[in-house]
UniProtKB/Swiss-Prot annotation:
Pathway: Cell wall biogenesis; peptidoglycan biosynthesis. Cell wall formation. Catalyzes the addition of glutamate to the nucleotide precursor UDP-N-acetylmuramoyl-L-alanine (UMA). It comes from Methylococcus capsulatus (strain ATCC 33009 / NCIMB 11132 / Bath). It catalyses: UDP-N-acetyl-alpha-D-muramoyl-L-alanine + D-glutamate + ATP = UDP-N-acetyl-alpha-D-muramoyl-L-alanyl-D-glutamate + ADP + phosphate + H(+). This is UDP-N-acetylmuramoylalanine--D-glutamate ligase. Keywords: ATP-binding, Cell cycle, Cell division, Cell shape, Cell wall biogenesis/degradation, Cytoplasm, Ligase, Nucleotide-binding, Peptidoglycan synthesis.
Amino acid sequence: MHDRLIDENPTCGFVRLGLDVRSRVIVLGLGATGLSTVRFLRCHGFECAVMDSRLAPPGLQDLREAFPDVPLFLGDFSRSALAAATHLVVSPGLSLDLAEIRESHRCGVRVFGDLDLFACCVRAPVVAITGANGKSTVTTLVGLMAKAAGVNAAVGGNLGTPMLDLLDAAAELYVLELSSFQLERSELFEADVATVLNISPDHMDRYPDLASYAEAKRRVFRGEGLMVLNQDDPLVAAMYRPGRRAVRFGLGSGDELDYSLARWEGRAWLLAKGVPLLPADEVRIKGRHNLANALAAVAIADACGFDRQAMVGVLRTFPGLDHRMQWVADIGGVAYVNDSKATNVGACIAALSGLEGKVVLIAGGDGKGADFSSLVPVAAEKLRAAVLMGRDGPLIDEVLKGVVPTIRVKTMFEAVRAARGVAQSGDTVLLAPACASLDQYEDYQERGRDFAATVRSLA
């Protein structure tokens, strides 16, 4: 909720972006983020135009109804409009390497994203959460812990509500999930508490190598806020800057860990600064990777001063997010689990590692340029078979062939039917695609719903 206009707030930080009422702003890319950006700019007295390479981008009808006077450029980018702009607010779905964006930047146009607009106006502490995997779960956990502790927290960003729509004078805390794409185009944002949960290859179609992807994630640690570091991940641990305040979490029990998993009175417990918090088997979300997520959430919640009993209550009751290790059905002694959000190799490995017994894996889709070879060790240990679909299913097949039996299919119906045919009592059929969904589906949610509906139809 944007409750002030720029002329009513002389201390507003738009000057940091060189923005004033004479600025010629183009919002590049519509969708949820672009629409929220237009709403924010207009509320604060700025004129803007919208440009999108798609003829019918998401949010178009809402934009036309709410702001019929905003100029629209759909289809090919308008070079003349770009040449006249002073500022480009680029939505995260667009690569900064696009020729038109590079040319604008070369000509002195200020290029940034919604995160820097947020940084100009935020007036309450901010928690920033990023990582290859687990960030939505940790963001949700921290938001629920804040609520349980009686803190008015606004939760969103890359998850749910766009961050500019969260801005509200009543908010006592902001909890943001941030993607590498949001971070890479920010120069101003600094969080009070920030974490990188883990680094594994993702979006390799947008980054030349893993180091570049990790560098984009590292930007969440700009400023002097508290660093929450996953000590089990060497790439994350190496992000520590001497002199910065930091706490560390991990699934080991080393002295360097502030938040850890350790045995106490014969059980595995989550420890917070050496104090037993709750038994690991009482954390409702299952999987070893989710214990790491729980520790990260506790570390952040501690930094925010939340009551620990509030944290424990959330960990005992939070069932997890849809399409993330979500139980669908037990049929003939076989469990069917939907982890459609496992859109990269690291997430697939984490899902497999957290399951007991043999697994029939359904994988494939848009691999985003990933190297699937790191699947081999866990596949050899865990898989009874792999059922492969989608555009890059053949690439996974090439990697796993000779390691485990593989089956190639075209549709989710064929995939579930094939998996049911090879699964044995006590096995798990797991949808953990290691790929994005856009080659066959609108998004990972639609893919997960298709899996769940197909499983139930075959019951």
